């Protein structure tokens, strides 16, 4: 009996040590970050956690996680993915006037939680310095869009995007026309509602 108990204790210890050694990815939620937490500090935390991280339109962490979420949704499986979108302001890419006006408000980070309940997609996005989400919405479709850069002098070679939409057949060309249209507000063109949750500019 004592030998059996000792063996059981040893087995528990082994599994405990294995768990510590393997170091499973720490999970954090958007609400874990106070509004006064610096954007750079949040960035470091989400990169060490189970988030998809996008820095200046390029994915730096969690790319496979985003694709796995999408694939699971296409199979009808419920799930959740968290996306952190981080922006800096490059003085070489904006006017001196704009840089002077906006530099103190950068870097910025937006925290998005996207869930699929088996039927619809629910999105909530919070600007890190705000207490409440700036976007809370539900969409019927998550559309993946991939393509080449629109011009030869673009700062990237190709793109990979995920867009929540009312229209499953929505295209990037339609979104671009809507973005530059003065007729309707952004995201509310004749193509229906849409909300881009993931952008990865690749190459160059």
Listing of model-derived features with the role each one plays in the protein:
Residues 23, 28, 132-135:
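N-terminal leader/presequence segments that precede the conserved core
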């Amino acid at each position: 009996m004592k030998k059996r108990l000792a063996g059981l204790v040893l087995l528990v210890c082994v599994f405990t040590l294995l768990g510590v050694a393997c170091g499973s990815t720490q999970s954090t939620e958007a609400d874990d970050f106070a509004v006064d937490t610096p954007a750079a500090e949040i960035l470091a935390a989400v990169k060490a956690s189970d988030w998809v991280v996008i820095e200046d339109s390029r994915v730096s962490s969690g790319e496979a996680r985003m694709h796995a979420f999408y694939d699971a949704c296409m199979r009808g499986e419920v799930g959740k993915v968290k996306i952190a979108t981080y922006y800096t302001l490059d003085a070489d890419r904006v006017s001196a006037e704009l840089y002077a006006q906006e530099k103190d408000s950068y870097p910025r980070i937006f925290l998005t939680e996207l869930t699929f309940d088996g039927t619809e997609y629910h999105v909530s996005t919070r600007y890190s310095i705000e207490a409440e989400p700036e976007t809370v919405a539900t969409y019927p479709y998550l559309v993946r869009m991939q393509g080449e850069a629109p011009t030869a002098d673009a700062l990237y070679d190709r793109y990979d995007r995920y867009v929540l939409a009312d229209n499953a057949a929505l295209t990037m060309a339609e979104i671009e026309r809507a973005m530059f249209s003065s007729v309707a507000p952004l995201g509310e063109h004749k193509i229906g509602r849409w909300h881009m949750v993931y952008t990865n500019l690749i190459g160059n």
